[in-house]
């Protein structure tokens, strides 16, 4: 080649430089969204909304409620290397913000048409600006490029339209809007999990419902459950590594890790370092090696980690998109994390599950095996669940005559005595000899906002794992009638449950769902409300008893219509609610039911408080009483077992929603499992 014909070296045009740089930073819509979310977080936003069209290729928009952008800063907003985050290179060692180069918005403006609407809290109106190739441009032909006043709320709205309109090769490579939307959804989910103090919404243009909506009221664990489902959330364990637990000064880590029983299609690592979403190949490999010691081949894991270290130990100026960072003592940090991970996995080693092994066909059956579409699967007997909650019990197959000969019917149970120091003997005897008539009334339709609100509270308080255990359990038997403990099996686990506390939630939820449609137990001998009140509260203050009686008499229409509690004008109780014809409450608790309706327990003048308080009192009235050691004879225990097996536990399985409080108080507690029992007895 002729030397003179060679192209000469010359500096590139600034516009070409900017487009090349933009291609490095903004590879796809996902990168633009990441940069804009981080800008919103830097601005102190507590609410971030993402709007997308065609996966962000035609339109992407970020709306936040942050501090906003000053009017004087708008001309420099999309100019390269213009930033408010640092003044000199040494500031990188003390960086507390996400942005620092001043390249994100500049890069977006070189490959898209950018519109910004922003307002400070002190401004009387918002400002609207349009940018092309890093500079202000007129919003419409003939207009001034200067920002224009407009209506708007505090914060900033940044819209980028027609992404890569001037980079045809990149635009032709990104044709799948659904794939881009999926990537952005995953990105927003990760930021939402980490920033639990910020609300995130992600929505497609034209959709009425957001594809992702996570409130700032949700904790990190709740957001993981919402995004990945209860199956993933139930296998997560807290991870915490304080500053004193590592040899690295100023280093700490927290998050969630999956236990040895976790299984999913693929592993998932969400890593934040100093609140930056980053990738670390070294840390990922270290985690995989640690999990490999405890998991079977092909198993997966879920890890969310937030690492915090001194800014001086972190180098964020490594990659154009800032997804890769370098930090000091990376080996020591990885070792500390993996050691802690190993400790947690060892403690949860009993939760490990093993894959089912396909049976290897013999040589003689090879041809048959090849032609078969399904392979025989072997289940190890220490993991073989031999029970099914849908199976009929042996007792249900026996005749009624046989059951009557073996034990008395639960409906004829002798009423226990009221154990109260100040009890009234005549009233107590009336309760003991109480005769009732069952009346089931036709259903009414009652539509109250307070009841809907209480029903919503029950649903929002649901503990998914505990509810699944109750929904799919197999009743085993009564353990301790004195402490109201029974045993159930769920899959390979054996659990003990406090059926007393669970009964309260069952009957309270029945009160809510059947509100205004209860049956009646009509008392053949009406009881004095004053006498019932005095059994619990004593008869020293007659004025309180009379005042309470007048209150119930004045509310007798409401009590009758809503709760099937019948009170005469003379202050006599003639009927109490019947929640189920298959179950009779312990009528010796009637004094406590009446006493629980006093104004000291709830506000009679507030509709929601009043209805809720009465339903709670009815639920407590229906809870089965514990049997004392003196009363624990064969007859009483058989009657209780019949009640548990034939009514209560089938109802737990059918309709109860277990609140988080019950699980936290260990009212449902796993005591062993089939693999553990097999290790002891070598048979199941």
Swiss-Prot record:
Leader peptide range in chain numbering: none
Query: Example GO biological process term?
Result: mismatch repair
InterPro entries associated with the record: DNA_mismatch_repair_CS, DNA_mismatch_S5_2-like, HATPase_C_sf, Mlh1_C, MutL/Mlh/PMS, MutL/Mlh/Pms-like, Ribosomal_Su5_D2-typ_SF, Ribsml_uS5_D2-typ_fold_subgr
Instruction: Identify the Pfam families for this entry.
Output: DNA_mis_repair, HATPase_c_3, Mlh1_C
**Where in or outside the cell?**
Nucleus
- Asked if the keyword Signal belongs to this entry, the reply reads no
Please provide, in alphabetical order, the Gene Ontology terms of the cellular component aspect for this entry.
Answer: cytosol; mitotic spindle pole body; MutLalpha complex; nucleus
Record key words, sorted: DNA damage, DNA repair, Nucleus
Tell whether Ion transport is among the UniProt keywords.
no
* CDD domains xrefs: HATPase_MutL-MLH-PMS-like, MutL_Trans_MLH1
Q: Which GO terms describe its molecular function?
A: ATP binding; ATP hydrolysis activity; ATP-dependent DNA damage sensor activity; mismatched DNA binding
Q: What is its main location?
A: nucleus
Tell me the protein family, please. Answer: Belongs to the DNA mismatch repair MutL/HexB family.
Q: Which NCBIfam families match?
A: mutl
According to its UniProt entry, what is the function of this protein?
Answer: This protein is involved in the repair of mismatches in DNA.
User: Known PANTHER family for this protein?
Assistant: DNA MISMATCH REPAIR PROTEIN MLH, PMS, MUTL, DNA MISMATCH REPAIR PROTEIN MLH1
Protein name, UniProt field: Putative MutL protein homolog 1
Name the source organism.
Answer: Schizosaccharomyces pombe (strain 972 / ATCC 24843) (Fission yeast)
């Amino acid at each position: 080649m002729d030397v003179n014909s060679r192209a000469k070296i010359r500096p590139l045009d600034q516009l070409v430089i900017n487009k090349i740089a933009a291609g490095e930073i903004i590879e796809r819509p996902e990168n633009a969204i990441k940069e804009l979310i981080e800008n919103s977080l830097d601005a102190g936003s507590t609410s971030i909304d993402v709007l997308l069209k065609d996966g962000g290729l035609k339109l992407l928009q970020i709306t936040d409620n942050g501090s906003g952008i000053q009017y004087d800063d708008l001309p420099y907003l999309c100019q390269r290397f213009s930033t408010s985050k640092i003044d000199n290179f040494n500031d990188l060692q003390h960086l507390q913000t996400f942005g620092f180069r001043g390249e994100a918005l500049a890069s977006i403006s070189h490959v898209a048409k950018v519109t910004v609407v922003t307002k400070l809290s002190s401004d009387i109106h918002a400002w609207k600006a349009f940018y092309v190739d890093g500079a202000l441009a007129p919003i419409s032909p003939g207009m001034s490029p200067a920002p224009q006043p407009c209506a708007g709320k505090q914060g900033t709205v940044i819209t980028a339209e027609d992404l890569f309109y001037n980079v045809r090769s990149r635009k032709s490579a990104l044709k799948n809007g659904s794939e881009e939307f999926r990537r952005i959804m995953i990105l927003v989910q990760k930021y939402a999990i980490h920033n639990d103090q910020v609300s995130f919404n992600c929505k497609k243009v034209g959709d009425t419902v957001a594809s992702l909506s996570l409130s700032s009221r949700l904790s990190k664990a709740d957001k993981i459950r919402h995004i990945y489902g209860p199956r993933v959330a139930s296998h997560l364990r807290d991870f915490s590594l304080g500053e004193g637990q590592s040899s690295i000064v100023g280093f700490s880590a927290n998050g969630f890790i999956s236990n040895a029983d976790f299984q999913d299609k693929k592993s998932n690592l969400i890593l934040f370092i100093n609140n930056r979403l980053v990738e670390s190949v070294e840390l990922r490999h270290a985690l995989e090696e640690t999990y490999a010691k405890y998991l079977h081949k092909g198993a997966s894991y879920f890890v969310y980690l937030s690492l915090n270290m001194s800014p001086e130990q972190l180098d964020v100026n490594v990659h154009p998109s800032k997804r890769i960072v370098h930090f000091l003592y990376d080996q020591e940090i990885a070792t500390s994390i993996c050691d802690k991970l190993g400790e947690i996995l060892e403690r949860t080693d009993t939760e490990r599950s093993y894959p089912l092994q396909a049976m290897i066909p013999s040589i003689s059956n090879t041809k048959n095996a090849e032609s078969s579409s399904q392979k025989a699967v072997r289940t190890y007997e220490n993991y073989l669940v031999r029970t099914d909650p849908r199976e009929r019990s042996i007792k249900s197959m026996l005749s009624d005559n046989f059951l009557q000969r073996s034990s008395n019917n639960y409906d004829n149970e002798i009423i226990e005595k009221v154990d109260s120091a100040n009890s009234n003997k005549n009233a107590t005897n009336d309760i003991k000899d109480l005769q009732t008539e069952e009346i089931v009334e036709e259903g009414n339709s009652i539509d109250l906002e307070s009841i809907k609100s209480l029903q919503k509270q029950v649903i929002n308080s649901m503990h998914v794992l505990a509810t699944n255990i109750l929904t799919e359990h197999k009743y085993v038997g009564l353990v301790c009638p004195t402490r109201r403990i029974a045993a159930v099996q769920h899959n390979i686990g054996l659990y003990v449950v406090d059926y007393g506390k669970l009964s309260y939630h069952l009957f309270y939820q029945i009160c809510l769902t059947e509100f205004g449609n209860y049956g009646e137990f009509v008392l053949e001998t009406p009881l004095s409300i004053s006498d019932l009140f005095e059994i619990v509260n004593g008869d020293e203050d007659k004025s309180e008893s009379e005042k309470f009686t007048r209150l119930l008499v004045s509310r007798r229409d409401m009590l009758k219509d809503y709760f099937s509690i019948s009170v005469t004008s003379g202050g006599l109780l003639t009927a109490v609610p019947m929640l189920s014809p298959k179950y009779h409450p312990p009528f010796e608790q009637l004094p406590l039911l009446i006493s629980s309706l006093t104004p000291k327990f709830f506000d009679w003048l507030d509709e929601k408080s009043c209805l809720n308080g009465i339903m709670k009192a009815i639920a407590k009235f229906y809870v089965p009483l514990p049997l004392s050691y003196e009363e624990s004879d064969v007859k009483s225990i058989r009657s209780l077992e019949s009640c548990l097996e034939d009514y209560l536990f089938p109802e737990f399985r059918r309709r109860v929603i277990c609140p988080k409080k019950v699980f936290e108080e260990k009212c449902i507690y796993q005591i062993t499992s089939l693999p553990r029992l097999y290790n002891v007895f070598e048979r199941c």
